Amino acid sequence: MKVRPSVKPICEKCKVIRRRGKVMIICENPKHKQRQG
């Protein structure tokens, strides 16, 4: 899980979701997991 000020989809399988007001990226590739800090 990467915590970044700006999250962007890295590949086509990355999905942008919102959980408890936080923007997150979920993907098949675990390296692509991000959340906005």
UniProtKB/Swiss-Prot annotation:
What's a GO biological-process term for it? Answer: translation
| MF (Gene Ontology) | structural constituent of ribosome
User: Which keywords annotate this record?
Assistant: Ribonucleoprotein, Ribosomal protein
InterPro entries given in the database record: Ribosomal_bL36 (IPR000473), Ribosomal_bL36_sp (IPR035977)
What PROSITE patterns does its record include?
RIBOSOMAL_L36
GO CC annotations on file:
cytoplasm; ribonucleoprotein complex; ribosome
Cross-referenced SUPFAM superfamilies: Ribosomal protein L36
What is the similarity comment for this entry? Belongs to the bacterial ribosomal protein bL36 family.
- What's the name of the protein? Large ribosomal subunit protein bL36
Q: What is the lineage of its organism?
A: Bacteria, Bacillati, Bacillota, Bacilli, Bacillales
Protein's gene: rpmJ
